[in-house]
Amino acid sequence: MAPAASASASAVVTPSSFRCVPTASCGLGARGKAPAPRRLLHDHAQGKKRAAATWSLKAGLWDSLRSGFLKSNNSTETVEPPSAPIEEEEPLPEELVLLERTLADGSTEQIIFSSAGDVNVYDLQALCDKVGWPRRPLTKIAASLRNSYLVATLHSVTMPSKAEGEERKQLIGMARATSDHAFNATIWDVLVDPSYQGQGLGKALMEKVIRTLLQRDISNITLFADNKVVDFYKNLGFEADPQGIKGMFWYPRF
């Protein structure tokens, strides 16, 4: 899919395994004769003591490594041992009514924002057609939605004035963001149905997307904008080429 539209643009050591290496003290006397039982028991006990002492020393070293105390330049730095990975909590989707109005035929229309990512690829393709974006394979559209960190939508929901009428739901806007889930996010594919433009819905959609990312502790937010919408994004707080940083692109040359 087309971009939103230039960018307001850081050893686990495990104890060794031990094995017995045959030596003169392992129990065989000169010329292969077996030692006396008492000597055998004595040697066996001594061997066990030495093995226990060796294991104790190595285990002690392992424990000291695991405790995370590393001495360097006469200072002590505490290094916590790696903990079990914590599963990331799935953010709860948000849904709210941005606008409600009564139409000429008496029906009621609501414009609903949602961050649940509920998008029908055929509806999205139809919306892209309305704004003049080139068509992309539906499988790739579906993959882009599935792999996005956040997919926000605007739907028009029309409720008839008569009880027997059917509710109509139409996709009129969308924006999505990809992210490393920690520091950075990039906003893509911001679009609003032309018949709903000029009503502040695009601004409301973007403000909700930005707020949602900030609530998830992601504050480095970028996007790509063509010349026609640069001022729109500047009014939302985006800055072009901040501190001389340039967005760079690589395209295949074949």
From Swiss-Prot:
Expressed in roots and shoots. Optimum pH is 8.8. GO terms for biological process: circadian rhythm; defense response to fungus; melatonin biosynthetic process; mucilage biosynthetic process involved in seed coat development; negative regulation of seed germination; photosynthetic state transition; protein quality control for misfolded or incompletely synthesized proteins; regulation of anthocyanin metabolic process. It comes from Oryza sativa subsp. japonica. This is Serotonin N-acetyltransferase 1, chloroplastic. Optimum temperature is 55 degrees Celsius. Residues 1-74 form a transit peptide. Its EC number is 2.3.1.87. Its main location: plastid. Plants overexpressing SNAT1 exhibit tolerance to cadmium, delayed leaf senescence, and increased grain yield due to increased panicle number. It is found in: Plastid, Chloroplast; Nucleus.
